[in-house]
Curated annotation (Swiss-Prot):
Record bears the keyword Transcription: yes
SMART domains registered for this protein in UniProt: E2F_TDP (SM01372)
Phenotypic effect of disruption: RNAi-mediated knockdown on a ced-3 mutant background results in ectopic egl-1 expression in posterior ventral nerve cord neurons. RNAi-mediated knockdown on a simultaneous lin-39; ced-3 mutant background results in ectopic egl-1 expression in midbody and posterior ventral nerve cord neurons.
Naturally occurring in which organism (per UniProt): Caenorhabditis elegans
Localization terms from the record: Nucleus
This protein's name: Transcription factor efl-3
Pfam family, one: E2F_TDP
Length: 600
């Protein structure tokens, strides 16, 4: 039975309802429980805080989880607030900032600061983790990779000696020779061939005969086939049972040593260095199959992602150090990541500066290590190649002419001169060009004609021109027909000396020459006057005084008929019309049908 706070037998809240959540063996004591005073009713006296806390018993751990009064702290009447939670939220950073690649770069900076003035070059991991503001367990993977690269060596608990990465080319030379001795290039090649080939799978009910094989006829006595790979280089050799058991124990012991993070890092570099110089790259599936599984006993199927998790951490640290880079390739329509070796060349006498390599990565925007995050630029290029980011109209489709686009017929004429505007704009209306050119040509023709008349009038009075203009000298001979002209008779002017010619020369008063054209006959002008210039006779006043009646009235029609009869008009409504008009009350004799009527 549940009770309510404030009663004499106040125990707990909702104990009966939460019996299934109470751990077995938990005992509850009957203790009085008092609610704290509401915040509103509390006194604001500063000395109130110095008072002794009320003797309220502390609830048990189980009770603090089950009861609704769990907001009480174990100090008495203090109430927990969300201030501490808000402070914790401010310290929370994004996952990208916690990535292993960025932690590796910060680790190198912290190691450099710790070993600058040290003669022993010994570092303390807790000091480095405190300087990086991370937990100590977060840098263990980085330390293991550094141990695999002979950069750090453990001297004591949490103490390591920094040896540097200057001898990294010599280490790569030794790893490459070890990979060749173990035959690692052949194993990598077999795994790549197995993953890129098709393998025939036999039916589990192969003994039933031809019913399991669709589309073929096989006799019932035929033996089922066994699965075989599609390449000839892989062969299964039968070995004695004792040799297989001994080999399995050795492989198990060797596999246990190779599963460590340091050994896995070395063998991953061996897989990369086993390829030639120009193709030192391997996919994640091939590397995980060669390093984590035994392909000859477990098959060529890539291991699960959970088993490859340690290989991911190794690759992220090596990417941050600038030894490898992650590139995405297309295998058919599937995007697969490849790790490409970009570290120092294997050499016994070479040296390597890891800090310079990291600075080069940070300065280059294309090679910034983003560890588990795919590079935006690479992802965009892969999507365009694979067709994931299709567009409605690509640049190639825009350059091609559409089939529904109407074509404008081009008018080419020798008479129309090409203008710059016409050459630049192909969509210009050619009819307007022709009209504009014709109007401009007509204006030029009129201007030249007027100029020629002016020249002819002035040339007639100049003494220096004794002969008429020839056709070659006239500016408009190709456009105007020659006019019949009589020979000009110009009077001879008296000669005057040259010094006084400019002052005393004047044109003599001569009569204006008249030209006689025998073929010319004047035509009377047919120009009519304007409407505003025309005069009309005024109407008589009698017409204005007449009472004009509508023409559709019967009396008007009869009156017009009488007027026309008086004017000896042959048309009369009463006799000659097809529809005779008869006044009211007047009758006419009927005539026989077919009788010829007198129309006079």
């Amino acid at each position: 039975m549940t009770t309510i706070f404030g009663s004499s037998n106040a125990m707990f809240l909702n104990i009966e309802a939460n019996k299934e959540n109470i751990p077995p063996g938990t005992e509850f004591k009957k203790e009085s429980f008092v609610l704290p005073e509401p915040r509103v009713n509390r006194t604001t006296d500063p000395d109130h805080e110095n008072l002794l806390p009320s003797p309220v018993p502390r609830p048990s751990p189980a009770m603090s989880q089950l009861s609704d009064a769990s907001f009480l702290s174990q100090d008495g009447g203090a109430v927990n607030t969300s201030a501490d939670e808000a402070d914790d939220d401010l310290e929370v950073t994004s996952r990208k900032e916690k990535s292993l690649g960025l932690l590796c770069q910060r680790f190198l900076i912290a190691i450099n600061e710790e070993t600058v003035g040290s003669s022993t070059r010994e570092v303390h991991l807790e000091t480095v983790a405190r300087k990086m503001n991370v937990e100590k367990r977060r840098i263990y993977d980085i330390v293991n990779v550094m141990e695999a690269l002979d950069a750090m060596q453990k001297t004591n608990k949490s103490y390591y000696q920094w040896q540097g990465l200057e001898s990294l080319p010599k280490l790569m030379f030794d790893l490459q020779n070890e990979a060749v001795e173990e035959g690692l290039p052949e194993r990598v090649l077999r795994v790549e061939q197995a993953m890129c080939s098709f393998t025939e799978l036999s039916s589990p009910r192969g003994k039933q005969g031809f019913k399991d094989i669709v589309g073929s006829f096989v006799s019932c006595t035929s033996t089922p086939t066994t699965p075989s790979t599609s390449f000839d280089s892989v062969t299964v050799k039968m070995e004695p049972a004792g040799l297989l058991e001994k080999r399995s124990r050795v492989d198990t012991r060797d596999r246990q040593g190779r599963n460590s993070l340091a050994q896995l890092c070395r063998r991953f570099l061996m897989v990369l260095l086993s390829n030639p110089k120009n193709i030192r790259k391997v996919s994640l599936d091939v590397a995980s199959t060669v390093l984590i599984k035994d392909p000859e006993t477990e098959g060529f199927e890539p291991p699960s992602r959970s088993r490859c998790r340690r290989l991911y951490d190794i690759a992220n640290v090596l990417v941050a150090l600038g030894l490898i880079k992650k590139v995405h390739y297309l295998f058919g329509t599937k995007k697969i990541p490849l790790f490409v070796y970009c570290g120092p060349e294997p050499d016994q006498t070479g040296s390597f500066d890891v800090f310079q390599s990291v600075e080069r990565l940070l300065s280059s925007s294309q090679n910034v290590p983003q560890t588990p995050i795919i590079k935006a630029q690479t992802d965009k290029i892969v999507q365009q190649i694979a067709g994931f980011g299709k567009r409605t109209l690509s640049e190639q489709n825009l350059t091609k002419p559409s089939g529904n686009t109407p074509k404008i017929a081009k008018i080419k004429s020798a008479a129309v001169r090409s203008s710059p505007m016409y050459m630049e704009n192909n969509l210009f209306m050619f009819a307007e060009v022709v009209t504009a050119e014709a109007a401009a040509e007509k204006m030029r023709y009129d201007a030249f004609a007027q100029l020629s008349r002016t020249i002819l009038g002035s040339v007639a009075s100049i003494n220096s021109l004794n002969a008429p203009l020839t056709s070659s000298q006239h500016p408009m001979t190709s456009r105007l027909p020659p006019l019949p002209m009589a020979p000009l008779q110009l009077p001879k002017l008296p000669e005057i000396p040259k010094p006084q010619a400019q002052k005393q020369f004047t044109f003599p008063a001569t009569s204006r020459p008249r030209f006689n054209f025998p073929d010319y006959t004047p035509v009377q002008s047919t120009i009519r006057p304007l409407v505003s210039q025309m005069t009309f006779p005024q109407e008589s006043s009698q017409l204005h005084n007449l009472d004009v009646k509508p023409k559709h009235l019967m009396s008007n029609i009869l009156g017009e008929s009488k007027k026309f009869k008086n004017n000896q008009n042959t048309f009369e409504h009463t006799t000659s019309s097809a529809f005779q008009v008869v006044k009211k009350g007047e009758t006419r004799p009927k005539k026989v049908f077919g009788e010829i009527q007198n129309l006079q």
